[in-house]
Amino acid sequence: MKANELKDKSVEQLNADLLDLLKAQFGLRMQNATGQLGKPSELKRVRRDIARIKTVLTEKGAK
């Protein structure tokens, strides 16, 4: 997910994407805790995508 792609989305769509990613992050954290996580890099990718969305939401709120 690129920041440029996110800037084209509406605030409602960004909030929906953020909610989906937070749910995915929770599931990945549970898999990691139980030792079932196959790709640890997936947790890192989701965390960074969440940060990107929050950054774009903050930028849109400041305008």
UniProtKB/Swiss-Prot annotation:
Any one Pfam family here would be Ribosomal_L29
Q: Which GO terms describe its biological process?
A: translation
Record bears the keyword Ribosomal protein: yes
Q: Name one GO molecular function term.
A: structural constituent of ribosome
Q: Does the keyword Ribonucleoprotein apply?
A: yes
Classification via InterPro entries: Ribosomal_protein_uL29, Ribosomal_uL29, Ribosomal_uL29_CS, Ribosomal_uL29_sf
List, alphabetically, the PROSITE patterns matched: RIBOSOMAL_L29
Give the record's keywords alphabetically. Ribonucleoprotein, Ribosomal protein
Which family is this sequence assigned to? Belongs to the universal ribosomal protein uL29 family.
Q: What protein am I looking at?
A: Large ribosomal subunit protein uL29
**Annotated organism of origin:** Neisseria meningitidis serogroup B (strain ATCC BAA-335 / MC58)
